[in-house]
Amino acid sequence: MKARTILGNLVNQASQHVIPNNLKQGVMKNWLASNKEKNTFKRSATSESLRTEKELKRHKNDNCLKTPDADVEEIEFIDIGATNIQSPKAALLVEEIHFIDIEDYDNKTNAVLPVGVTDIDTIHGDEQHLWSEYAPEIYAYLRQLETTNQIKEDYLRGCIITGQMRSRLIDWMVSVHLQFKLLPETLFMSVNILDRFLEQEGKNTSRDRLQLVGVVAMLIASKIEEIYIPTIDEFVYSTDNAYNEEEVKDMELKIMRTLDFNLTSPISLTFLRRFSVAGNVDVVEHSMAKYILELSLMDYGLVGVHPSLSAAAALHVSLLLLSPSVPVWSPGLEYYSGYSRECLMPVVRRMISLLESAEDNRLQSVRNKYSSRKFRRVALLKEAKKEFLTKRMQFA
C-alpha cells in the first residue's frame, strides 16, 4: 500500500518499508563523518558549582534559563579516558520554567570560574575538534539562538495535522534515518525543520502531504550535516514511491522559503555533548540520555521546550537511573548547563513518563534502535523498565 494512503492512519510503519542493500550502498558515510565524533569526551576532574541569580519575565510566564555526543556509527568512537567508549499541554511545562536574563549568561563567557568548578575548556584545550578556546562564546550564542528560534508550544492547535500524526511521522523518520545510516545531528535537525515549517504552514498542510514534509526535512538536513547524501530517488523510495522527484523539489523550495532560508536553530544533541563532558559521564550514561532525547522528539508536549533544557533534563534522568548513589546534578553540571535541579523537574518527570510507556507504545523505532549493541542496549537495561522507573520517581 502506498504511504500516501496510509497517512489517513498516519505514516507507514518502518517495518513495511525497509530500504534494500543496493540502496544502502549508495548511502555511505565517509570515515571523516565518523571521525567527527571521535574522542568527543575525555575524563575531566569533577566539576563543582554555581548558581545565577537575576530573573526576568519572559512572555506571560515566569519562565528557568540561567547561564550557560555518536549514534548509529559514532557511538563506537566515543572515547572517555582510557575506555572506548505522549500528553499534558506543553504550556503546563513552560509555566513551570523560569528564565534568567541571557546577559547574565553572556557575562559568564569572560567570568572567573567559581571555586570548585573545573574549567573543562582548558582541560580539552589541545582537542582542536572541540574548539575549546571559543566554546564559551559558541554556547552563549547557541543559547541566544534557541530563544530566538523557539518553537511555540501546542502549535498544531486548529490544524488538520495532530500531535499524534506528528509522532507517527517522526517514528517513521527515525527508521529511515537508521536505514540510511545518517549522522545523529541529521535526525534532530530534520525534526526541527519539520516543526518550524508546520508551525507556520500546519493549517495549509494536508494529511497526504505530511510524509512528504518529513522526508524533505530529512533531505534538507542531510545536505547540511552529511558528507554523502542520499539521492532524491532513495528518499522517494523510502516513502514507497508515494511522491515523485518534482514533488520533492517543490516541497524543498517551499520549506526553505517558509523558513526564510534560516536553518541555524541549535539542537539538543549539541548541548548534551557539552553537558556530558561537564558531568564526566560514561558512554552508557550518555547513550541513555540520547535515548531519552530521541523519545522526546516524538512527544508533542515537549516541542516548546528549549533544546538546552531538554538536553539537561535527559542527562539528569540518565544519571538518576544509572548513578543513583552520587549527587545527580553536580555544581559543575549546574554551572555549565545553566539549569538548577529545580528548574529541570517538570521536564524530568515528563521524560520519565516517556520511558515508562516506551515498552508498551506502538511507536517502537527509537526503542528498537537503542536495543541494539551499537547503542549499548540501553533501552533493555533494567533501569529503563517501568518497575524500576516507578521506584526512582520518588527521587525525581
Locations of regions flagged by a protein language model:
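Acidic, serine/threonine-rich low-complexity regulatory regions at protein termini
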Residues: 1-215, 219-396
